[in-house]
């Protein structure tokens, strides 16, 4: 049997092993020293940045990703559609850091923190389980 090496492997339905690994990865990122600003949705009113939604039109945060992976209270999970593919999960994580860069600019301390967390994500992604091998007869 051969191993699929193309990036299309992440377009397949999420396996149980991938879901568990992704959830563990997100929880690890949230615990990082630099993870704090990315745990919850940006409260732009409390932070006094009312223009935030005009710049960041598709907000995302690690806590929301965790819920979409099945983490957190069951009644909260019902409000978050689960990921169908690993690609969708990866896209949401990348969106967190793209939004950070778009709003804060490249030299802001929060952006630097985001780069550190994203680097840890990239390292963890290298160990993401592949799809369960299927025999073809």
Residue ranges and their predicted role:
Residues 9, 20-137:
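Bromodomain acetyl-lysine reader domains
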Residues 1-17:
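Eukaryotic intrinsically disordered, low-complexity linkers and tails enriched in Pro/Ser/Thr/Gln/Gly
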């Amino acid at each position: 049997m051969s191993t699929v090496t193309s990036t299309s492997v992440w377009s397949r339905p999420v396996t149980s092993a991938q879901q568990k690994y992704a959830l563990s990865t997100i929880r690890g990122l949230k615990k990082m020293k630099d993870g704090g600003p990315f745990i919850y949705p940006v409260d732009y009113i409390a932070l006094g940045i009312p223009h935030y939604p005009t710049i960041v039109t598709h907000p995302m945060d690690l806590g929301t990703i965790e819920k979409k992976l099945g983490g957190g209270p069951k009644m909260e999970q019902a409000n978050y559609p689960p990921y169908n593919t690993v690609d969708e999960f990866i896209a949401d994580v990348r969106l967190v850091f793209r939004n950070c860069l778009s709003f804060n600019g490249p030299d802001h301390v929060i952006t630097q923190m985001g780069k550190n967390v994203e680097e840890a994500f990239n390292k963890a992604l290298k160990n993401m389980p592949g799809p369960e091998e299927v025999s073809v007869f």
